């Protein structure tokens, strides 16, 4: 496999800046339910080294999938007080996992543990920016 830079991946996948930080592009939107919300959506998401996205939550279950680059740390909080961490990546022997589920309404943020991380995120019911909540700057669980 050829080693690519984050800029090359961003260009090849036509990614755009995401409001929470990082780069993304929606790759799939399922048919809508009776209220017009897609049954599910999927995105590519890239986070560059030394960066982490802002704490945020959505009203739907998210399934994160590792695709390439370096591992990614995912932090979540179900109650805004307690925090858990998981590693998304290919090295199963070191505790990384290629998939991680974040239940609806859980606070979350991610950080890249190398040069860049490319993941996919499948959301059900489908992601809508109107149901996305960004935490106040500086907010941390606890």
Describe the residue ranges of each PLM region.
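Non-catalytic, conserved peripheral segments adjacent to functional cores
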Residues: 2-101, 107-110, 114-117, 121-142
């Amino acid at each position: 496999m050829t080693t690519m830079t984050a800029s090359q991946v961003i260009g090849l996948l036509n990614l755009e800046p995401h409001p929470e930080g990082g780069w993304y592009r929606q790759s799939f939107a399922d048919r809508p339910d009776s209220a017009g919300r897609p049954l599910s959506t999927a995105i590519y998401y890239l986070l560059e080294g030394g960066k982490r996205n802002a704490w945020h939550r959505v009203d739907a279950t998210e399934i994160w999938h590792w695709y390439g680059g370096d591992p990614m740390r995912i932090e979540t909080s179900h109650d805004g007080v307690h925090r858990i961490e998981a590693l998304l990546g290919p090295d199963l022997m070191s505790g990384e996992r290629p998939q991680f589920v974040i239940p609806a309404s859980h606070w979350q943020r991610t950080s890249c543990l190398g040069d860049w991380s490319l993941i996919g995120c499948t959301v059900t019911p489908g992601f809508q920016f109107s149901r996305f909540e960004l935490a106040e700057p500086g907010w941390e669980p606890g």
